[in-house]
Amino acid sequence: MNNQFTWLHIGLGSFHRAHQAWYLHRLIASGDNRWRIAAGNIRNDAEQVVQALAAQGGRYVLETVSPEGEREYEEITSIQKLLPWQAGLQPLINEGANPQTKVIAFTVTEGGYYLNTRHRLETSNPDLQADLQGECKTIYGTLARILEKRMADNAGPLTLLNCDNVRHNGERFHDGMVEFLQLTGKQAVIDWMAANTTCPNTMVDRITPRPAADLPARIKAQAGIDDKAPVMGETFIQWVVENNFRDVRPNLEAVGVEMVESVIPYEEAKIRILNASHSCIAWAGTLIGQQYIHESTLTDVIYAIADRYVTEDVIPCLGDNGIDLPTYRDVVLKRFTNPYIQDTNQRVAADGFSKIPAMIAPTLQECYQRGVRPEATAMLPALFFVFMEQWHKGTLPYQYQDGILDAQAVHEMFEAQDPVAVFARDKALFGDLANNADFLALMREKVAAVYTLIN
């Protein structure tokens, strides 16, 4: 019986290489060499990195740095097969359908799931429309081809593992995948998927900025390695995974992964406290002319906005969930002050149109359900509103990236007679609160407060 297994990762970015690949590397280094990573991308916008990694045999150096400036260097060797991008993604599809592949994991960002506030597919999205016609521009079109081939080849069961910052990420992906297959008339694949796959929920955490320009020189000086594709991240790392794998899995708990019955308490704390605060700080910092997360966090007025949001609204909403939330808040905000990873506001500010409904709107809604006006939380969408107003005017200091940005709709919003009303009444962002008169009044107050902050 073959006991060599492949973990296929789709989305070969810095985060995967600083997080999941690090854990698999530690597992291999411990003497468990049954697993290896094969990795590739759906898009061809990172082929330079893939080619550099291929030339290095998949090896690269990870630099980690603490808030105190302590740096460590580790050569990561778990990625042992690089899948070059081709139109049609045949190398990726073949690897996914290989019987040795037992886990397919993916990091395609929050916007890469194309889900609306009701967790249904945004079928009007051009990439999704292309995939519904048989192309492979999204995770759904790509995995549909893999699952179809795996079914035809009788390649056996496997686990589909979402590693993105999406609430209930395994379930959301599963439902989106099934809806996609329904829309393409692939009932046989749906049946096969139900019998042969699971989609565990996960929570991932390690701040991973874009590699600094001087990183290769630092690695050469400190580790003596010429590396054309290094990555960097903070020292802190966490991975919580629902123990619901369909077939064999790596012994992840041996290297510090928390295998649990339910990920929900961890993901709620992380998404609301870390992810939402991170974006809040990036939007606010940008608006007052700052470039980096650490300098934005260390600005008293911005720190206070994030701290109030968590303390006054998030912690009461989450209640006693088994996690020490005040301590978690303090640890998160301390991590954001790390000046050595040089994390940019540009990176963290991205994908706001996915983040508001996923990370911020639930706290707004739950505050109203508790009979509390969400004064502190409302500052977050107000910051994003003014941030996007600067985008509309062309005065942002960098290019804003958003996988589901409808540029025409945003320009029309700011050209309307009452832009704040258009924003607050957007069901895609705020769900049922779009019909709440007090929420509109609150947004007017907070947008005015943001103007005061930046002027």
Swiss-Prot record:
GO terms for biological process: arabitol metabolic process; D-glucuronate catabolic process. Keywords: NAD, Oxidoreductase. Pfam families: Mannitol_dh, Mannitol_dh_C. Transmembrane segments: none annotated. Gene3D superfamilies: N-(1-d-carboxylethyl)-l-norvaline Dehydrogenase, domain 2, NAD(P)-binding Rossmann-like Domain. Pathway: Carbohydrate metabolism; D-arabinitol metabolism. It comes from the Bacteria. Its EC number is 1.1.1.11. The keyword Transferase does not apply. Belongs to the mannitol dehydrogenase family. Monomer. NCBIfam families: DArabDhDalD. This is D-arabinitol 4-dehydrogenase.
